[in-house]
Each structure stands twice: as C-alpha cells, then as structure tokens.
C-alpha cells in the first residue's frame, strides 16, 4: 500500500464507496483534529487501532487527511489550524518520507448551511483557509475537493447528500475521480 487516508465519517464513506482498493483507510465517525492521534480508529473496515501505531509500523509514500466537520463549533479557525499542524507534525515524524495532503473539509449542502449557525459553509471555509496555510508546497499540500460536489453557490449539491453533511454512496466516486484527475491517478486505484 502506498497511500493512507485518515479522517472521520466522511473518510469512512470514501473507504466504503470510493473504490480505492489499494489504499489503507483509518477513520472514526466523530474524529477531530483534537483527538485523532489519541483515539482508536477503524482500519480498512476492520479492527481498531491507534493512528500512531499504524504509522510507526508501516511506511506510506502518500498520506491524505480530512477532518474538521465535527469540531466546527469548537474553538477558532486559528486554534483548529494549530491542532491540525500538530497532527501533521506527528505524522511527519512517523512518516518522514511521505508526501502529506490535507484535503479541505467538504462543504455541507446549501440548505443545511443556511439552517445552522455552526455547521455552515462560512465556518467550513474559514477552517479550510486556516488548514491550507499549513501546506508548504514541498511535502505538505492542500487539496480542495469541493469543486467536484459544488452546487454553484458554495454548497454540496443537495441531491448528492442524504443528510446535508455526508454524500450518498453513489457520489463518493466523484470524489475519487476528482482526486485521480488532480495528479494522484498513479498513486490510487
């Protein structure tokens, strides 16, 4: 395995429905930048393990991480970026040769965004901007996957989501195809 994907329930969806068979996935619904290094995550749909244990025992060439939706109401974008940066630094220490991709947090639907003071696309954009600042253009990069599910006004297309936050199963392949079209087609299958 050359690629590892890390995240919350949205990454879990990518594991189950994104058709990325040759990558490892570590995820937990509800995971945040504040706890992802200290909680047990599911690995490839199986047993649970600590992220640091997996990253200590196996080297990856590329690591993709997306978290953020669960902590939208917790702390400021700058505090979020600091915690994310600390997580990335821990990953870097355990994976010195890996290229790390921070995947920008997926928006919610416009309808969902308009109905929430916390879980809305303005808050997501503020945190995505903060997370993007961690990228260094050498071995840490930022990817904004929102364009593959965008409704034209900054939200996920309503029909693509079953709850306003998560994609329906059939739309995770759009995310996979977007990633393959943006320079990583030889890394994931």
Language-model segment annotations:
Residues 1-83:
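Conserved SGNH/GDSL esterase-like catalytic core that processes O-acyl groups on lipids
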Residues 26-29, 103, 143-148:
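Conserved beta-strand termini and adjacent loop/short-helix elements that scaffold enzyme active sites
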